[in-house]
C-alpha cells in the first residue's frame, strides 16, 4: 500500500451529498477482485452520457461536459472535496480502488459512510472530516480560484489553504500509523512473520500428525 505522509494537490469540488458507492463505481464494473482497472469508470454514470460496459473503449463514448471532473480546470485533481455522507450505499472495496486509480489521494467531506471510511484507510486513501462551515468555505474558495490546491500533512493532521490558513482534522492513531507507513492488513501481518514462522515450527514439531508431509 502507498504510504501517505504529505501531499499537495489540485482540488476538484463534487458538490453533491449522499454520493453512494454505486455512483462512485457502478455495479456492472465489479467483475474483478484485482485492484486495478476501475479508475477509467469512476463516476461513470456522471462522466458519460451513455451506459458504460466493462472493457469498453471510453475514448469513443459521449462525454458529459457538465460534470465537474470533465472540466479542463480540474484535470489532474488529486484531492476531492465532497459533501456529507460520502460513500454511502452498498459495501464495495472497488470504490476506494477506483478513486485511488483515478489519481485521488484524499477526500475531504463533513462526514463519510462507515464502511467506505474504513475501506479507504486500508487502501492508502485518506478521508478527512472537516466541519460543514470549513467545507462550505473550501467550496467557495475552489470555485473562485482556478488551480486551487491544498497541502495535506498527515503527521501534523493539518490541511493548509493557499492563503496560509490551517484546518486541523482528527484521525485514529492506529489508522494514522498505518497510512504513514504504508501498512495494509497484509503488511501488518508480515511485520510479525518471524513470530508466525516460529509458532508454525513449534506447532508442527509438537503435533506432527496434523501435517501430511511430517
UniProtKB/Swiss-Prot annotation:
InterPro entries for the chain: 3-IsopropMal_deHydase_ssu, Aconitase/3IPM_dehydase_swvl, AconitaseA/IPMdHydase_ssu_swvl, IPMI_Swivel, LeuD
Catalysis: reaction(s): (2R,3S)-3-isopropylmalate = (2S)-2-isopropylmalate
Gene Ontology CC: one annotated term: 3-isopropylmalate dehydratase complex
Signal peptide span: none
Domain of life: Bacteria
A GO BP entry: L-leucine biosynthetic process
Disulfide bridge positions per record: none
Stretches of the chain forming a coiled coil according to its record: none
E.C. numbers: 4.2.1.33
Any GO MF annotation of the entry: 3-isopropylmalate dehydratase activity
Metabolic or biological pathway, per its Swiss-Prot or TrEMBL entry: Amino-acid biosynthesis; L-leucine biosynthesis; L-leucine from 3-methyl-2-oxobutanoate: step 2/4
Keywords: Amino-acid biosynthesis, Branched-chain amino acid biosynthesis, Leucine biosynthesis, Lyase
Family that this chain belongs to: Belongs to the LeuD family. LeuD type 1 subfamily.
Subunit structure: Heterodimer of LeuC and LeuD.
Role summary: Catalyzes the isomerization between 2-isopropylmalate and 3-isopropylmalate, via the formation of 2-isopropylmaleate.
Protein name: 3-isopropylmalate dehydratase small subunit
Recorded name of the encoding gene: leuD
